[in-house]
């Protein structure tokens, strides 16, 4: 499970330099780390959770479009473009009818990404207080 995958422009007060260096974007480093640490037979994420819609949690650098040209690769989008995600969970899907500036370029980019990738992965709204939204998918009886 991945919780948040942000990316900010240098100069943004929330910007943190990519580690180990700036030769890749933060999303690319996240993918590299997961692929390095995950078992070879399990090179994917079961869940990714976006806690809220700030660039340091979902990505806000809008400079490199994906192959289709329909949205920019940044943060969680870069992760999803390079690693299979079984379920993406955020706090507003599908109607986003709470305090979200739907005219914000970063939010529009995220919506475009969801629209054009909806057949590739499941997307679901986070439900506070439930204990079954994120289930152990492998050998769960071992942890019962």
Region roles according to the model:
Residues 4, 52, 88:
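Divalent metal-coordination and catalytic microenvironments
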Residues 1-44:
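Conserved beta-strand hairpin/beta-sheet module of binuclear metal-dependent hydrolase folds
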Residues 33-36, 40-47, 58-144:
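Flexible, acidic/histidine-containing loops and adjacent segments that form or flank the divalent-metal
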Residues 7-10, 52-57, 93-97:
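Solvent-exposed loop/turn segments at secondary-structure junctions
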